[in-house]
Amino acid sequence: MKVHHSIVAAACFLVATVAGVTAPRITTVSIAGEGFLINGKPTYAGRAWKGQSVEGLLFNSRMVQGIFDDLNTNTVSKWAYPDTGQWDAERNTREFIAAMPEWRRHGMLAFTINLQGGSPQGYSREQPWHNSAIAPDGSLRPDYMQRLQRIMDRADELGMVVILGYFYFGQDERLRDEAAVIRATDLATQWIFDRGYRNVLVEINNECNVRYDHAILKPERVHELIERVRKVSRDGRRLLVSTSYGGGTIPKENVVRASDFLLLHGNGVSDPKKIAQMVRQTRSVAGYRPVPILFNEDDHFDFDKPENNFVAAVSERASWGYFDFRMKDEGFGEGYQSVPVNWGISSDRKRGFFRLLREITDVRP
């Protein structure tokens, strides 16, 4: 079936190229109650693991650097590949795309990517590098968006969902004012519709409660952008949208009421019991109604232990997402956020995640 989908996608792309129109898309994500569906069918349909249903969950990984580049000539040399001594944005995207089928074969149905990336060091106090698909006036940079389109086209072919973040707190200062933020939101939303993507979940910004410059990206007002995206429709279809908070933070009522699904982060939460508690607390926020709860960032591992954050999320019927970066003195094979990235399943931590993911989902590579 995967081969068939690839052939169909390639044929449709050729027809669309000749005709000058957007290719028909293969993958559609939707929501029913607390579960996700792909092409009208619950994810991991009928699957249970250790007595716990995983049907409708959306296991994922934080892969935010898929279109990374650095426009700051003073810092770009930091990201040189060890084999060439140079940074190469095209190579980064090309290797990302090449790795995607293997992620999918292990049962991973979604990944997060961001128009402004994330810290290329994993965590950073200062972020002088300039990595943004969004120009100061809110327009979209064509080179970044062309790289993103290649990734999203491949995700569509593979039956994968893209959690697309618009803004990141380490780069939002690159936009000159609130009008630029609103323009970027509108243009990114239009870009998705113009290309016919139906496999997208929008994350307005990564961790809205962390040092953003623009007030509309902060917790008190971010729901305005969520609602703005939700109001846009084309051919009777609109995008599914939410935003996230820093590790351990429970979404606020304004975001809970406005969102189609709820994003949690497990960074800083080392006790799996507290991960389960976060899910229960989220369901208790005023305005909550049955929608999916999804962790899309958690830098805790212990995948070989009976209790870990991944397992704890599953126990509360919440989706979970892996966040890994290259730690001090580690080699090129480690992490999916530190630049340059080895996008393969190239380390013990990565293998541990994908091994447990494959066990939980019963997907065979």
Segments (PLM) and residue ranges:
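Active-site mouth of glycoside hydrolases
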Residues: A32, L37, P42-T43, A48-S259, ...
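Extended substrate-binding grooves/exosites of carbohydrate-active enzymes
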Residues: T27, E34-I38, P42-E90, S284, ...
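Bacterial N-terminal signal peptides
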Residues: A9-T17
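Extracellular glycoside hydrolase catalytic/binding regions
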Residues: R183-A184, N199-L201, N205-G352
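Short, flexible coil/linker elements and helix-boundary hinge sites characteristic
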Residues: M1, D156, G196, G344, ...
